[in-house]
Amino acid sequence: MEQPERSTIAREADRIQQATASDARRRALAAACVGNLVEWYDFALYGAFATLLAAEFFPGADPAGGLLATFAVFGVAFLARPAGALLFAHYGDRLGRRWALAVTLLLMAVVTAGIGLLPGYDSVGWLAPALLVLLRAGQGVGLGGEYGGSAALVVEYAPADRRGWYGGWQWATVALGLAAGIATAALLSATLEGPALRAWGWRLAFLLALPLGLVGLYIRLRIEETPGFQAVQRLGAAARTPLADTLRAARREVVVGFGIVAMISATFNIFYVFLPSQLAITGRAPLTRALAAALVGLLVAAGAAPIAGRLSDRVGRRPLLVAGVIALLLLTVPLTALLQRGEPGGLLLGYILIGLALGTLVPSTFLAELFPTRLRYSGLSLTYGLASALFGGTAPALATFLVRRTGADLAPAWYATGLTVVAIACVVLAPETAGRPLDAGGELASGPRG
């Protein structure tokens, strides 16, 4: 069947958008953000408890080897993300965002709570790490479908002149979810004696995921489908093969998004997963001190994101992207050197500056605006799922390997800097997306603007 013009979809979506009450928009924003926060809380726990999980599931290895094995399992979730991204994007672009996002949240909550119930290596031998791998893969499938769907939902509900503001809150809840996971780990580490924390304390944080997930699920089930997807449905324009259509019609957008997400994901995981554990096992800083500084950095990123998003509504997406990427290019190596010293003031300053740079990027709105509504869930999920799997999930294990092989503490920082150079090239190729209707054209073929 012949598809309607993108401008026709844009006009229909705009008509539905104008009829959408402001409280419905607020509910949709809350549904996306609360669920997103819960899912990233779930995901952050594994990295925050990496040293304890290494002892629980890989007790025979030396501390560095056990940490490497734990980070390898950490990467399993990222490798599973493309499967979740493709699965949920297929149904999200065919049937709607709402139900796909409800299932991703429920899956994430159940498998995270399952990690809290796992027996240790001393009880069941190698079955314990095998089950850990299985549940981490389940986390990856759930989170693989979350980011693209929540970004699509937020941007499609937002008024055209406030998409950056809405997307900024979606990006902020990524940082807030990670911060909540780290804060929970830090609180338990500070309040429980060592034996109690190792025996059962860490499990409480994982079990908390289930009631939190059910709250988020309740909120998500109370919203309507987005105005943009309602327009696609009414016009009979829903894609039958969203993935194939995305690869055929939006290859350049996928490449640009891939390069940007690869840099962000790797940088996030090097600074917020690898470095705190590395500082702890090398004795340069207690884990609680490193986690506290990382927590402050995430809160700074969360605070910066909505402000940067609102600013991008006024000056455009590309200026904010350029500012954030150049800041990371200049700061990653020197701030890693500062953090590696383990001094309280240096840790705090380093994580604040990294948080500001990452918070400024606000990629959610920009990436969502690159793709047409009928392919948005697939485009976002494909870009995010593949980039985070290949570069984000492997970053902690690769960073650990690089330090062990080269003896250079800054090797992971140089790796992240190399990815930042690639991201700069992608930003240069990207069009300005602010202010235009979501389906009004302006693809990459028209070249950068703004």
What is each stretch, according to the model?
Residues 216-223, 366, 418-444:
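Multi-pass alpha-helical transporter architecture, strongest
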Residues 318-363:
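C-terminal transmembrane helical hairpin of 12-TM major facilitator-type secondary transporters
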Residues 85-97, 305-317:
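Helix-to-loop junctions at the C-terminal end of transmembrane segments
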Residues 50-83:
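Extracellular/periplasmic helix-loop-helix junction of adjacent transmembrane segments
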Residues 47, 251-300, 392-396:
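Extracytoplasmic gate region of multi-pass secondary transporters
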Residues 106-124, 326-341:
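C-terminal ends and interior cores of transmembrane alpha-helices
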Residues 165-189, 212, 383-395:
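Glycine-rich segments within core transmembrane alpha-helices of 12-TM secondary carriers
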Residues 94-106, 314-325:
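Cytoplasmic membrane-interface "Motif A"-like loop-to-helix N-cap segments
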